[in-house]
Structures are given as C-alpha cells and as structure tokens.
C-alpha cells in the first residue's frame, strides 16, 4: 500500500477578523424625501455662491478658500463641473501671477487640478539672503498653508524643499508651546494632524471625518456648506454600509475559515482600502468589483507566500495564465476552490461590462492579474532555491508584486462613460505614475514588515538586499528608503501635471492607492496586525455618523 507523504507547508498564523459578522446585515432605511430635498437646496446655494464669485475678481481669493473647504469636507463630487470651471478660470485669468489672497492655497488647488503653476511665486516669502521673512513666521495659518502646498513639489523645486523644511520646523515649535504663538487648541490640534500626515497624503474620506469638526469650530464657517457636508457624509455612509454588507455576504458564502483557513480574513480592512481609492457615490459598482479583486489578490499572495508548495504553485500559475475552466482538474482541491472564485468573479463583471460594449475593461484587469501571479511565482522560485537577488533584480519583480500595477487598471473597470481603452493600455505598460506608487507601496511595506518575514522562509526584502550590497546598517537603509518614498511622491506629482493623455480622475486612482499605503503601512502592517488606528478609522467611516 502506497504511503501518502505529508506536505510541509510554510504556514503563517493570522489572527481572525476582529469584526466578525458585524457588517454582514445592513438594515436599509428608505431615504427621507425631506432630507433629499434639503440636500438639493443646499447644493444649489453653494453652486450659486461659486458662480457669483467667479465673475468678481475681488471674490477670487474667497472662491479658492470655498473650493478648498468643499474638497476637504468631502463633497467636491457634488460640484465637479463648477470646481473645474472655477479653477480653470483662475488659471486663465492669472496664469502664474496670482494676485489674490493665500499664495499657498492657490498653488495647492491648481496643482491638484493638474495645472503646472510655477513655484517661483514663493520667492516673495524670502529675504535677499535666502532666509524666510519674519512676517511668515508670525502668520501661523500662513505657515500651515505653505507646509501643505509644499507637498505638491516635483524634483528640483528647491524653494519648496526649503519651504517644507522651514515650515515643518516652525510648526513643530508651535505645537510644543501653542500659547506663546497665540495658537488656540483647535488650531494646535489641526497642526499636529498636518505634521502627522499632510492633506496631499491623506485618504479623502478620512479627511472628511477630521475636517468637519475643525471647520465647525471656525467662526467664519459657511452654515449651508457644513450642513450639506454632514448630510452627504451620512448618506454616503449608508451606501458604503450597504456595499460592505453585500461584500461580506459574498465572502462568507465561501466559508473562508473552512476552505481558506490560511488566508488573512481582512475583508472589512480591504473594503476600507478601496474606499481610499474612491468613496464617491458614482463609483459604487467599481468599488465592489475592486474589493473582490483585492480580496482575491490577498488570497493569491497568502497562497504563494504562506501555504502553497512549489510544484503546486507552478501548476497554479500556468492555470491563471491560461485562464480556462479546463485547467481546474490539474489543481489540488484547495486551489480548485480559489481558481473557481477567480474565474467566476471576473466572469461576472465581464458579463456586466459586455452589456455596455466594454468587456475589454475586464480583459485588461485579467491581464494585470496574470502578470501579478507570474511575479509571485518568481518570488516563490527564489524562496524555494534560497536565491538572494540583487536589488535591481528584486525591484523588477517586487514593484509588480506590490500590487499597484494590477490594482490601477482594475480600479478603472466600470468607472463610467469617460473611461476609454487607452488608459487600460497605458496602465499595463507600468508607466512612471504607477511605478512611483509601487515604489511607495513596496518600500513602506518592506520597512515595516521585513523583520517579521525574516523569521520564516521568505524571499529577502529590499531592505536586506540594500544592506548586503552596500554593507550599511539597517537604520541607514531606513533613512535612505524614506527619502526614496518622498522622491516617488515628487515623481507622482510630476506625472499628475504632465501626463496629459490620461484623465485626471484616473490618475487620482493611483495617487489614492499611494495614500492608502501611507495610511495603512506607516507604523505597522495593519492588514496582518489590525491596530487601534485602522480600527478607529473603520469605525469613523462605517459606524459613527455625523450629528446634524
């Protein structure tokens, strides 16, 4: 009788989901017609305010402040055309020679919108000897605005590098002794949060949670705008909870604790990740698909990394590459289960998009997933052979396995009429924008996770590769890699401003993916270890409503 040899698997023990079935059931309530009518009335009020200010140069500074508040309150999707018109008009009228109020708000808003305005305008903040003027130091809010604007810098913009270093130092002093600077507690807290994470690196939905209470405390706040922001937050929260319930049922039906016991059970955290990519109501269909995609990618990652043995992984990679149900019989039982989920999920979305004549969108999403799986396989081969790649070899592969080359085109699927085939083709070439976001993802992940991964059989990280090649300390690599992350942000900013053949709405998906990493991997791996910060963020987005 043949003795069946036991397969030794490199399993990691992940903690179960802390949420249980909390989001499984959503008690949907019919929207109050009176509230819906009020929202429309408030929108009209704000719309009129924007358009009135547009034609009066004396109101242009206030117009920019209004646009900034609309964006930070999370309701810019309500005024997309008006904001585009307003910022386009400001650029047409002033070019690089802004004459109104805050230079920093003007600069930040126009660069965010894709206008490559010059940073030379900030020279007026400097003395002849290159130091910053005392008048700036005395203006706390002005320093904060300049600090935020400086994060829109590209490589070579020395004045913005200087401005960031200067304002950061000054703002840190203020937070240590706010009373000395006549800084109230609300503004001091606002500054601390900015130093922790600037606007440009924040997840837009979390900025809403943070900014609404601050805005409400300002004497100059616009009551209609505030009320609209709160009502829209709650309305959107209901939509998000409904989506999360739908996704929770989808995942629970697979009985993951039984059939995928080795996989991180992090559906809620992954939906939060996708909410960072787009939270707006018009992207509901895309959000649901992308959450399924990132969940599948997590299953693949854990299979290649933590459970599958080499021979199985070779067959599995070939099956994904061929993408045919005829491949399923060659797979081990647990892989058959995964493969069926994979084919069914993409097939379902392909049918939906085919009904709109856009099945090609899912084709490109599939091609991106195939590329991800091929590179997972290369890492598995290195681990199996005990091979230590050079840093260059490593990054050729690990920038792909960071996942953003796959997630970017996948995030475009179902976004609407403005998405043509060209952006999908562009995304699959691994262009500079997506590569830079992948640098942020890979490096921040490796800095946080390389020590834990080093405790088991695992491909070496970029941190170890660099240490070995250059014979330097771990701390040296950390500092160097953090500079690389900042340079990657500068490169993303440049692409946002110069990659003109891709719509801004699509480029922002990649920017938002990088923002997610800044939120989830800054201090810990919040997918493996669901810490207090991400728990609080999830509660803020899905459980705690705004009081009206």
UniProtKB/Swiss-Prot annotation:
> Any idea which positions bind Mg(2+) 3?
445, 453
Explain how, and how many, cofactor molecules are bound.
Binds 3 Mg(2+) ions per subunit.
UniProt xrefs under CDD domains? Terpene_cyclase_plant_C1 (cd00684)
List of residues binding Mg(2+) 1: 301, 305
Q: Which reaction does it catalyse?
A: (2E,6E)-farnesyl diphosphate = germacrene D + diphosphate; (2E,6E)-farnesyl diphosphate = (-)-(E)-beta-caryophyllene + diphosphate; (2E,6E)-farnesyl diphosphate = beta-copaene + diphosphate
Q: What is its EC number?
A: 4.2.3.57, 4.2.3.127, 4.2.3.-
Question: Which terms in the Gene Ontology molecular function aspect does this entry carry?
Answer: magnesium ion binding; terpene synthase activity
UniProt note on tissues of expression: Expressed in leaves and stems.
Q: Which SUPFAM superfamilies match?
A: Terpenoid cyclases/Protein prenyltransferases (SSF48239), Terpenoid synthases (SSF48576)
Q: In which pathway does it act?
A: Secondary metabolite biosynthesis; terpenoid biosynthesis
Self-association or partners: how does it assemble?
A: Monomer.
Q: What is known about what this protein does?
A: Sesquiterpene synthase involved in the biosynthesis of volatile compounds. Mediates the conversion of (2E,6E)-farnesyl diphosphate (FPP) into germacrene D, (-)-(E)-beta-caryophyllene and beta-copaene.
Report the domain remarks: The Asp-Asp-Xaa-Xaa-Asp/Glu (DDXXD/E) motif is important for the catalytic activity, presumably through binding to Mg(2+).
| Protein's UniProt name | Sesquiterpene synthase TPS1
Species name: Xanthium strumarium
Q: Which gene encodes it?
A: TPS1
């Amino acid at each position: 009788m043949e003795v069946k040899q036991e397969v030794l698997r490199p399993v990691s023990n992940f903690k179960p989901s802390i949420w249980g079935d909390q989001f499984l059931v959503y008690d949907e309530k019919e929207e109050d017609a009176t509230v819906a009518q009020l929202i429309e009335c408030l929108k009209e009020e704000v719309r009129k305010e924007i358009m009135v200010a547009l034609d009066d140069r004396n109101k242009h500074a206030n117009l920019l402040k209004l646009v900034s508040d609309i964006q930070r309150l999370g309701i810019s999707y309500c005024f997309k055309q008006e904001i585009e018109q307003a910022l386009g008009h400001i650029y047409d009228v002033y070019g690089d020679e802004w004459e109104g109020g805050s230079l920093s708000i003007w600069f930040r808003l126009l660069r965010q919108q894709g206008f490559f305005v010059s940073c030379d305008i900030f020279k007026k903040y400097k003395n002849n000897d290159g130091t910053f003027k005392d008048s700036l130091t005395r203006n706390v809010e002005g320093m904060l605005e300049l600090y935020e604007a400086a994060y829109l810098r590209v490589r070579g913009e020395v004045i913005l590098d200087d401005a960031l270093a200067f304002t950061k130092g000054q703002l840190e002093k203020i937070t240590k002794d706010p009373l000395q600077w006549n800084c109230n507690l609300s503004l001091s807290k606002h500054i601390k949060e900015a130093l922790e994470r600037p606007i440009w690196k924040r997840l837009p939905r979390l900025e809403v949670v943070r900014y609404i209470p601050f805005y409400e405390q300002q004497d100059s706040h616009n009551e209609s705008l505030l009320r609209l922001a709160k009502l829209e937050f709650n309305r959107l929260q209901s939509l998000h909870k409904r989506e999360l319930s739908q996704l929770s049922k989808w995942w629970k039906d697979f009985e993951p604790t039984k059939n995928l016991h080795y996989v991180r059970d992090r559906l809620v955290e992954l939906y939060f990740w996708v909410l960072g990519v787009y939270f707006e109501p018009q992207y509901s269909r895309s959000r649901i698909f992308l959450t399924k995609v990132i969940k599948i990618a997590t299953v693949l990652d854990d299979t290649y990394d933590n459970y599958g043995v080499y021979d199985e992984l070779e067959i599995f990679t070939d099956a994904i590459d061929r993408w045919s149900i005829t491949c399923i019989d060659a797979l081990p039982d647990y892989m058959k289960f995964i493969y069926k989920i994979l084919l069914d999920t993409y097939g379902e979305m392909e049918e939906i998009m085919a009904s709109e004549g856009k099945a090609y969108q899912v084709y490109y999403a599939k091609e991106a997933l195939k590329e991800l799986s091929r590179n997972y396989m290369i890492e598995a081969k290195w681990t199996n052979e005990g091979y230590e790649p050079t840093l260059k070899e490593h990054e050729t592969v690990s920038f792909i396995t960071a996942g953003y080359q796959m997630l970017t085109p996948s995030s475009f699927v179902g976004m609407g009429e403005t998405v043509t085939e060209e952006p999908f083709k562009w995304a699959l070439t691994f262009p500079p924008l997506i590569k830079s976001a992948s640098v942020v993802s890979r490096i921040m992940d490796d800095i946080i996770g390389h020590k834990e991964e080093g405790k088991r059989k695992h491909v070496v990280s970029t941190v170890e590769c660099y240490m070995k090649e250059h014979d330097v300390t771990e701390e040296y690599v950390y500092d160097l890699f953090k500079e690389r992350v900042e340079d990657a942000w500068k490169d993303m900013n440049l692409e946002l401003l110069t990659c003109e053949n891709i719509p801004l709405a699509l480029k922002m998906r990649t920017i938002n993916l990088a923002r997610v990493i800044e939120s989830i991997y800054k201090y810990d791996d919040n997918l493996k270890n669901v810490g207090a910060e991400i728990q609080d963020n999830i509660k803020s987005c899905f459980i705690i409503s705004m009081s009206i």
